[in-house]
């Protein structure tokens, strides 16, 4: 018998990857506006557990951010 006050535990729904799907944006090193959404206010790449980006797309995203930094499109450090 279940207790009267017992509740189901809360399960947070897993977010889906923003780069998968029909009309998802393409990861491009020239799209600095898109890349800035995945860089913290200190200039670090935000981990996928926070942004819910899949592992494959996170590697692509990190590569694009690093390429944009090298070409001067994104800053390495934001002060």
Swiss-Prot record:
The UniProt keyword set, sorted, is: Ribonucleoprotein, Ribosomal protein, RNA-binding, rRNA-binding
Which NCBIfam families does the UniProt entry name for this protein? S18
Q: What does this protein do?
A: Binds as a heterodimer with protein bS6 to the central domain of the 16S rRNA, where it helps stabilize the platform of the 30S subunit.
Taken from the UniProt entry, a GO cellular component term is: cytosolic small ribosomal subunit
Gene designation per UniProt: rpsR
Q: Which domain of life is it from?
A: Bacteria
Self-association state and partner proteins as the record states: Part of the 30S ribosomal subunit. Forms a tight heterodimer with protein bS6.
What is one process in the GO biological process aspect for this record? translation
InterPro entries documented for this protein: Ribosomal_bS18 (IPR001648), Ribosomal_bS18_CS (IPR018275), Ribosomal_bS18_sf (IPR036870)
| Processing and modification events after translation | Both N-terminus methionine truncation and retention have been observed for this protein.
Q: Which family does it belong to?
A: Belongs to the bacterial ribosomal protein bS18 family.
Residues in the signal sequence: none
What name appears for this protein in its UniProt entry?
Small ribosomal subunit protein bS18
**Alphabetized Pfam families for the sequence:** Ribosomal_S18 (PF01084)
Q: Which GO terms describe its molecular function?
A: small ribosomal subunit rRNA binding; structural constituent of ribosome
């Amino acid at each position: 018998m279940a207790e009267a006050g017992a509740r189901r535990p809360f399960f947070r729904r897993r977010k889906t990857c923003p780069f998968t799907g029909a009309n998802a944006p393409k990861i491009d090193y020239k799209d600095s506006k898109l890349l800035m959404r995945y860089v913290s206010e200190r200039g670090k790449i935000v981990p996928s557990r926070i942004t819910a980006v899949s592992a494959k797309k996170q590697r692509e995203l990190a590569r694009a951010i690093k390429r944009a930094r090298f070409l001067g499109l994104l800053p390495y450090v934001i002060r």
